[in-house]
Amino acid sequence: LVTVATPNSTHYEISKAFLEAGINVLCEKPMTVTEAEAEDLVLTARRTGTICAVNYGYTGYALVRHMRAMVARGDIGKVRLVVAEFAHGHHANAADADNPRVRWRYDPAQAGVSAQFADCGIHALHMASFVSGQNARELSADFISAIESRKLEDDAMVNVRMDGGTTVRLWTS
């Protein structure tokens, strides 16, 4: 097993090479920066008999698994709305622009089309999907950046309609 925890734009090439070599891959999110690359990794894993997984650690927590079981049993009724927030002060300072460990996260060529949502907000959306047993069907998003020089968002508000009818309202910053 190899873990890929590098800038997002490198995930596809690195993961593909290991899968082709018959080695299972645990990839940091996002799996890739394009849908076509992600689909290719799925097909490569199937063809080579390997596993290509994305690291969403929160769904391993006992409390999250307990919530999922409660929802599946109907203990709390139909889930109509999930409100999730994933807030932190990480990268809140404009001085972070000089930090090479931070800089790539706001560079579309390395991070892809999203920064904050792809890095943190996706955890909340994944938990909502995991707990509700529903998948995202459609979404609308408002991405802004408090630090104007950034090319990608450091604040995101996302509304998601799940395939079972649940609405997810998510904020991350």
Predicted regions located by residue number:
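NAD(P)-dinucleotide binding in Rossmann-like oxidoreductases
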Residues: 146-153, 163-173
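Conserved hydrophobic/aromatic beta-strand scaffold that supports enzyme active sites
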Residues: 81, 157-159, 169
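Beta-strand-loop-alpha-helix segment that lines the small-molecule cofactor/substrate pocket
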Residues: 1, 7-8, 12-59, 74
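Predominantly a Rossmann-like dinucleotide-binding segment in NAD(P)-dependent oxidoreductases
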Residues: 58-142, 146-150
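Short, well-ordered coil/turn segments that N-cap beta-strands
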Residues: 23, 50-51, 80, 164-166
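Structural detector of well-ordered beta-strand residues that form the stable sheet scaffold
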Residues: 26, 51-53, 83, 140, ...
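Short glycine-/small-residue-rich Rossmann-like dinucleotide-binding loops
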Residues: 6-7, 172
